[in-house]
Each structure stands twice: as structure tokens, then as C-alpha cells.
């Protein structure tokens, strides 16, 4: 009787272990679930654009907030050295040429950070609505402040 019970338990454990998903299958399932997450496609597209136009490790954070049929995106970037407002505007302009092609983005904010007195500080932030994103293709980089819905500049950029 005990022997029979032991065989049943061992058989059940063996069956359970053999039917458990492998680590690879588990990872694939998780990746597929992430791809179905609202905003995931936009987040990966924004990351690819930023990595194409900027130095490696420039991305601090990307937040995509789905709102009905559109998305609100926040891209936080790190400068490797303290740059001028002019250079940050040029870099932002270059990003916008591809960002504007992502039609689901309704509001796009780019925030630049730099080390000031050993502290990571937000030095320039620009927020664009959909209309401003479209306009960015028709103006020069130094006109970006005139089309944004929000423009914040740290005093160190003066």
C-alpha cells in the first residue's frame, strides 16, 4: 500500500515537472505579453530613434501614457557633458524629425539632464503637441521654443 502510494506521488511529481513550461517558453510568453501592453510599441520606437540620434546610454527614462486613441510620451535624456542650449535644441530637432512620424503620439516632452555641481539637474524641457510636432519639419531648430506648449530652461543655460 505504501509502495503504491509512493509510486503515485513520484509519478504525479514527474508529470507536473515535465509539463511545467521551460524557462525559454516562460520568457517568450512574457515578451509576448509585453508587446501587447499599451504603449510598448511606441516606447520601443522612441528608444530606437533616440539611440540612432544620440550617444549610447543617453536615455534615462521613457514613459508612454496611453490616452484613448493617442499617447503622451516623456523622454528623459542625459547629456554626457554640459552642452549649450543651442546644441540641445539641435539634438531635439533631430529627434523630432523621426518622432513626429509616430502618429499615435499626441504630446511629446523631451527633458535634458546634465551634471551641475555633482547633481543631475534638468536643464532644458520642451513639450510639443501634435500640431507642433508637425510644424517641426517646417522650421529650423532655433525656432523650436516658439512652437512648444511648454519650455523650461535652467539658469545655467543663460
Give the positions of each predicted feature:
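Stable alpha-helical elements in mature extracytoplasmic
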Residues: 42, 46, 88-92, 140
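Hydrophobic membrane-insertion alpha-helices, especially the h-region
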Residues: 2-15
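Short, non-transmembrane amphipathic alpha-helical segments
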Residues: 85-106
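Polar/charged, Gly/Pro-rich intrinsically disordered segments
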Residues: 52-74, 106-158
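Short edge beta-strands and adjacent turn/loop segments
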Residues: 26, 33-80
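Hydrophobic single-pass membrane-insertion segments
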Residues: 12-25
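Solvent-exposed loop/turn segments at secondary-structure junctions
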Residues: 80-83, 116-118
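Surface-exposed flexible segments
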Residues: 26-35, 90-93, 117-130
Amino acid at each position: 500500500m505504501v509502495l503504491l502510494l509512493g509510486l503515485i506521488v513520484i509519478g504525479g511529481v514527474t508529470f507536473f515537472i515535465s509539463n511545467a513550461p521551460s524557462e525559454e517558453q516562460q520568457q517568450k510568453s512574457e515578451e509576448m505579453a509585453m508587446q501587447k501592453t499599451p504603449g510598448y510599441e511606441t516606447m520601443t520606437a522612441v528608444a530606437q530613434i533616440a539611440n540612432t540620434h544620440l550617444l549610447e546610454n543617453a536615455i534615462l527614462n521613457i514613459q508612454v501614457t496611453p490616452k484613448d486613441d493617442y499617447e503622451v510620451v516623456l523622454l528623459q535624456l542625459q547629456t554626457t557633458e554640459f552642452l549649450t542650449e543651442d546644441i540641445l535644441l539641435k539634438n531635439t530637432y533631430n529627434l523630432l524629425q523621426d518622432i513626429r512620424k509616430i502618429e499615435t503620439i499626441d504630446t511629446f516632452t523631451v527633458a535634458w539632464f546634465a551634471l551641475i555641481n555633482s547633481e543631475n539637474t534638468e536643464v532644458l524641457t520642451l513639450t510639443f503637441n501634435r500640431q507642433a510636432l508637425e510644424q517641426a519639419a517646417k522650421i529650423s531648430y532655433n525656432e523650436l521654443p516658439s512652437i512648444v506648449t511648454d519650455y523650461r530652461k535652467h539658469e545655467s543655460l543663460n
